[in-house]
Structure formats: structure tokens, C-alpha cells
A protein has these predicted regions:
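Post-cleavage N-terminal segment of exported redox proteins
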Residues: 8, 18-75, 112-177, 203, ...
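Short Cys/His-rich "knuckle" micro-motifs
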Residues: 104-107, 204-207
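N-terminal secretory signal peptides that target proteins for export/translocation
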Residues: 1-17
Length: 278
């Protein structure tokens, strides 16, 4: 199309000329975006960080603000029941080890966390399944299952309002940097990076919807688009598919490293779990 001459253009039929014109407009728009885009993503200053909550409509904010109106609370209620349910060969419940759920206050704010038994960081859902296999002698809950999301949401609710505070030390630093590399790396057929949207262009819109800063402050959360609760890994997979990139398998180290970086990137921001998003 870039070599289409005026004479060739005029010889096209009306419908074909219209199509060709649209393609030219798309190409020119794409070129202007590329030229306007900063070459290197810049980290958002702490004073300018904004939760996805601040980009939502008043109606959606009201849904998150009122537990009685939030559909996410259906999962939290299930999680409360699961917290007290005995399971596995050990016939133990979460409460048998941890007593009241309030003992989990601050846990979500600290995850993903380094697990010395495997020498890698793990996220909260993986920690729940480790407890099931090691303490309850039960089978792991399927990733993205209602039960696992419910437990993660119930545990996460105990940290609501607390500042995110993942560890940044000699054990986690290399994994945080690995997550940063994924965040800033161009991927997929669209040759986009996470940072281009969420660091450089968060004041803009995409298909009429606000581009947020991408802070992972409320997972697992209820997404109106999904009509269900979902994990941060599910959201990351959606983004990769949108970039026309190959998504990783659930629980892949790349996802956990990216989760860790995103929580480090949101350090100091309050936990919103279980959040609601459009």
C-alpha cells in the first residue's frame, strides 16, 4: 500500500478506493504513534501512582466501595467457609493452624514471597496449595478454580487497606529484575511492551477505555468483563493475547516474576482485595 500511486488509486473502484484509503489512514496513524512513543519506558513517580480504581466510573467505584453490592463478596463468603473446612488425609482446616483469618493480615501485601524450600518466589495461590499438600495432605486446588480464588480473596480481604510491601532484598532482587525485563520487553506480533501502555501512555485511551497504570493492587478481583473473579495471572495472559504474544502456562516462573515486579512497582499503595474492575 505504501507504493500505491495516485493513478493506481484513481483506477480502483469506489469500494476498493475506500478500502485503500482506510488502510493508508491506519498506516499513517500507526507511524505517528511509533514516532511519538518514547524510546525507553520511564517509571511512574511515586507521587503520581494511581490505582485502577481512580480510572473507573462512579458506578463501578460504588460497587467496590459497598461490600453488600460487590459481586466479589460471593467468593469471599465461599473462602470463609473453605477456611474452616477440614480437608485431606490430615483432616485439618486452615483455621486449625492459623486460627482466625485475621492472623493473615498483611499476607497479601507481602506476596509473591521467596520460598526457601524451592528457592523461588511463589504467589499467594501457590502458597495456599503448598499448605494443602504439606499440612493438610490434600490435593492442590486447580489454578483459577472457584475454590482457590475464593480462599485467596478471603485471605486477601484481611490485608485490605494495608500498604503493599513485598521484599526487595538479596533473595528477591534478581526475580524482581526478571519481572521488570518482561514488563519492558516488546513482545508479540504487535511488538508492544507492558510498559508502553502502563508507564508511557496511561493518560490516554484504547478503544475508548482509559489506559490505567496497571498496578496489581486488588487481586484476585471481580472483573465485569469476565463476570467472575480472576487472578492476576489470568489478567496477564489476557494482555499477552492482546499483544498477539504467546502466553505462558499458568504458574510459569515468568508470571510469578512479573507478579513480583508489579507488586514491587506498586509498593506503598493500599491493598484493595477483593477489588472490582470494568
Amino acid at each position: 500500500m505504501s507504493k500505491l500511486r495516485c493513478a493506481d488509486f484513481l483506477r480502483l473502484g469506489t469500494n476498493n478506493r475506500t478500502f485503500a484509503a482506510l488502510i493508508l489512514v491506519v498506516l499513517m496513524s500507526a507511524a505517528s504513534i511509533v514516532l511519538a512513543r518514547p524510546a525507553i519506558a520511564s517509571e511512574i513517580p511515586a507521587a503520581e501512582r494511581k490505582s485502577g480504581y481512580e480510572f473507573m466510573s462512579g458506578e463501578t467505584r460504588a460497587m467496590q466501595d459497598d461490600d453488600a453490592a460487590s459481586p466479589a463478596m460471593l467468593w469471599v463468603l465461599d473462602g470463609k467457609a473453605l477456611w474452616n473446612r477440614k480437608d485431606g488425609e490430615a483432616n485439618k482446616s486452615c483455621a486449625d493452624c492459623h486460627n482466625e483469618a485475621s492472623s493473615m493480615k498483611g499476607a497479601t501485601a507481602r506476596y509473591p514471597a521467596f520460598d526457601k524450600s524451592i528457592g523461588l518466589p511463589i504467589d499467594l495461590e501457590q502458597r495456599i496449595n503448598l499448605c494443602r499438600t504439606e499440612q493438610q495432605k490434600a490435593t492442590p486446588l486447580p489454578f483459577e478454580s472457584r475454590e482457590l480464588l475464593a480462599l485467596a480473596a478471603f485471605i486477601g480481604q484481611q490485608s485490605r487497606g494495608m500498604p503493599i510491601s513485598v521484599r526487595d532484598d538479596e533473595k528477591t532482587r534478581s526475580f524482581i529484575e526478571a519481572g521488570r525485563t518482561i514488563f519492558e520487553r516488546r513482545q508479540g506480533q504487535l511488538n508492544l511492551s507492558c510498559a508502553q501502555c502502563h508507564d508511557d501512555n496511561w493518560r490516554g485511551k484504547l478503544a475508548g477505555a482509559p489506559i490505567t497504570q496497571g498496578h496489581a493492587t486488588g487481586y484476585p478481583l471481580y472483573r465485569l468483563e469476565w463476570q467472575a473473579m480472576g487472578s492476576l495471572q489470568r489478567r496477564l495472559r489476557n494482555c499477552l493475547v492482546g499483544m498477539r504474544a504467546e502466553p505462558y502456562a499458568f504458574n510459569a516462573p515468568e508470571y510469578v516474576n512479573l507478579e513480583l515486579f508489579l507488586m514491587w512497582r506498586a509498593r506503598g499503595m493500599p491493598v484493595e482485595t477483593p477489588a472490582v474492575r470494568p
